[in-house]
């Protein structure tokens, strides 16, 4: 059994890349359909009105409107409140 490590070996130097998780659109912000609202691992935030959930638990807007965060039965929900179309 060797008592010295071979040349250029190290027990350090391994770390995973940051996954850029978190809330991407905050309460009151206007979003378009399809925009990502929250990137997460597990359901820290649950989908509410007009919000879909992807296979990796990412929450995204199903309709255009304003983001709203709320709590129901100790669950944090993300909703999209549709904004009425303004006649030009």
Swiss-Prot record:
UniProt key word Ribosomal protein: yes
Key words of the record: Ribonucleoprotein, Ribosomal protein
Domain of life (superkingdom): Bacteria
Pfam families (UniProt xref): Ribosomal_L27
Native source organism of the sequence: Corynebacterium glutamicum (strain ATCC 13032 / DSM 20300 / JCM 1318 / BCRC 11384 / CCUG 27702 / LMG 3730 / NBRC 12168 / NCIMB 10025 / NRRL B-2784 / 534)
Protein name: Large ribosomal subunit protein bL27
BP-aspect Gene Ontology terms: translation
UniProt-recorded Gene Ontology molecular function terms: structural constituent of ribosome
GO cellular component, one term: cytosolic large ribosomal subunit
InterPro entries: Ribosomal_bL27, Ribosomal_bL27_CS
Family statement: Belongs to the bacterial ribosomal protein bL27 family.
Region (Disordered): 1-26
Gene: rpmA
């Amino acid at each position: 059994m060797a008592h010295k490590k071979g040349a250029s070996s190290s027990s350090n130097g391994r770390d995973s890349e940051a996954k850029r998780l978190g809330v991407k659109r905050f309460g009151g912000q206007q979003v378009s359909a399809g925009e990502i609202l929250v990137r997460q691992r597990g359901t820290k935030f649950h989908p509410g009105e007009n919000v879909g959930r992807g296979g990796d638990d990412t929450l995204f807007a199903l309709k255009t409107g304003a983001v709203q965060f709320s709590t129901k039965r100790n669950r944090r929900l993300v909703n999209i409140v549709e904004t009425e179309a303004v006649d030009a």
